Amino acid sequence: MIAITLPDGSRREFPGPVTVAEVAQSIGAGLAKAALAGRVDGQMVDTSYTIDHDAKLAIITDKDADGVDVIRHSTAHLLAYAVKELYPDAQVTIGPVIENGFYYDFAYKRPFTPDDLVAIEKKMGELAKKDEKVTREVLSRDDAVKLFQGMGEKYKAEIIASIPEDQEIGLYREGNFVDLCRGPHVPSTGKLKVFKLMKVAGAYWRGDHNNEMLQRIYGTAWAKREDQDAYLHMLEEAEKRDHRKLGRELDLFHIDEYSPGTVFWHPKGWTLWQEIEQYMRRVYRENGYQEVKGPQILDKTLWEKTGHWDKYRENMFITESEKREYALKPMNCPGHILIYKQGIKSYRDLPLRFGEFGACHRNEPSGGLHGIMRVRGFTQDDGHIFCTEDMIQAEVTAFTTLLQKVYKDFGFTEILYKLSTRPDKRIGTEESWDRAEAALAEGLRASGCEFEYLPGEGAFYGPKIEYVLKDALGRQWQCGTIQVDPNLPERLDAEFVGEDGARHRPIMLHRAIVGSLERFIGILIEQYAGALPTWLSPVQVVVLSITDSHAEYAQSVAQSLQKQGFRAVVDLRNEKIGYKIREHSVQKVPYQVVVGDKERDENQVAVRARGNVDLGSMPLSAFVERLKNDLANKS
């Protein structure tokens, strides 16, 4: 007998080996029809998979996140099937699932056009309606290489040839199309009903710029039409909020071909940057951090000691001087340990919290650069806490509480907490991992946080927490982190004198709240669609004169606001007031103050808030109180 345990704890027994589909059928016809795949003892499998032992089984449908991934993976194969039907000379390469969709890379003699995408999507629909069965086959590596070589698919043959000789190769067949894949896939193409091709882009074979350029077709696929419609609407809204577009329109920054992946901040953008930096600097001061500053360039021998020279060198910018090799720092942590090591540290000095607005450089591939979100030169609100093992929990609690306040001040109230635990390849004892993971978990609980475990996702030297914020469009951004690290202090010989008089290694907690300031500013721009809260706006008030006769009063109003610390400018141009109001509205200035005869004569100001809200006339002192309230409330 084969005993199958279902997620609700119930058991079903079968006289012999049984497929996932048969188990689903035994539960009910509705579930059998909805089944897309199964999870047997934690492993994702096809519905045709035969279970020949007592096992735990979950039937996967389109209501499960894994089910949607199966739909997307299968739709990527459907895309390749359609391309081969329409363009037999095209060669297929790889087609993975990505966030909200999938892509597939093709080699073809000419670029695919928008009209081609329309034709391919139409063919995909036709193939899906045929409801062809999707079947799995297993071949030896050499037989699989011969199969794809015989089909003229040199890229697939190359991939398979790189797989160990003794490893079996899984293939999936639907109609006339066969592809290499681990699976699982939907049982038939008729399960694929909601999809759309999005765009074509270039991609190097195997991600190496020395290889030939392929064509990458991106698509999206969903369980329900309304889910796809909501996603497409979100994309439309995201396009309107694109920080690259708004950065140009609002004159905040630009990226120049003379320095790819680094940011040229314009006066308005740099004002925004400084406001965030000064805010975070106050956060440092008020929470026991000492601000430090390390050099940009460090000798390669330091990076050899940390292990980065061997594992990360290709992502570092290297330079040479007087026969010594140096690297622009890609992270700040080694420098903070060198500062820590200056002078003997006692257990009484711990926890010791360093913070730095550290400029880092990483040699990211040019194809991965994206506005100010993904750059080569960036600055982090980088902090490191040197402490003992029994201090970790309290530090995590304090840091998490602080992070929540900071995110709230910036307008982010929905935060996801993810605790990454020990990977298979790791250093340290099981007991030390137990203690570190427990300290992180208890630190989160003490902060009132519900969190998700990410098994095996920790670094080789210690567990970490990722703090993921959700923006106005529901997108997730991982900005904050706290990481337990006993390894780097060991490598760089950091010590403190314990209560027992002996020397001990400190634990190092790597932590960041906003992470890269460049990326965080990009997130803020998109969160607010450029209409930043008053406290962050580069220009908080613009004073507009109606005619030249009001210029002197307008200037006096602007100067009064400036002296009180507000970012105010004055527009004295001889233009129609409606034109000036529209122009500054496009620039998303929080407040426009209009002054004419009435305002000048009565010593008042006519105030318009962003969004064309007329607040009427008021004394300047009343408007100042409104501004102060905005700044105090971070609005």
UniProtKB/Swiss-Prot annotation:
Reactions it catalyzes: tRNA(Thr) + L-threonine + ATP = L-threonyl-tRNA(Thr) + AMP + diphosphate + H(+)
Compartment(s): Cytoplasm
Cofactor binding comment, as recorded: Binds 1 zinc ion per subunit.
UniProt domain TGS: residue ranges: 1-61
Main location per the UniProt record: cytoplasm
Uppermost EC category: ligase
Entry cofactors: Zn(2+)
Residue pairs linked by disulfide bridges in the UniProt entry: none
GO MF annotation terms: ATP binding; metal ion binding; threonine-tRNA ligase activity; tRNA binding
Keywords of the record: Aminoacyl-tRNA synthetase, ATP-binding, Cytoplasm, Ligase, Metal-binding, Nucleotide-binding, Protein biosynthesis, RNA-binding, tRNA-binding, Zinc
Domain of life of the native organism: Bacteria
Binding site for Zn(2+): 333, 384, 510
Pfam hit, one: tRNA_SAD
Enzyme Commission number: 6.1.1.3
One GO term describing the cellular component: cytosol
InterPro entries registered for this protein in UniProt: aa-tRNA-synt_IIb (IPR002314), aa-tRNA-synth_II (IPR006195), aa-tRNA-synth_II/BPL/LPL (IPR045864), Anticodon-bd (IPR004154), Anticodon-bd_dom_sf (IPR036621), Beta-grasp_dom_sf (IPR012675), TGS (IPR004095), TGS-like (IPR012676)
Region (Catalytic): 242-533
CDD domains: TGS_ThrRS, ThrRS_anticodon, ThrRS_core
One example of a Gene Ontology biological process annotation: threonyl-tRNA aminoacylation
The protein's assembly and partners: Homodimer.
Family the entry assigns: Belongs to the class-II aminoacyl-tRNA synthetase family.
Described purpose of this protein according to its UniProt entry: Catalyzes the attachment of threonine to tRNA(Thr) in a two-step reaction: L-threonine is first activated by ATP to form Thr-AMP and then transferred to the acceptor end of tRNA(Thr). Also edits incorrectly charged L-seryl-tRNA(Thr).
Protein name (Swiss-Prot/TrEMBL): Threonine--tRNA ligase
Species this protein is from: Ralstonia pickettii (strain 12J)
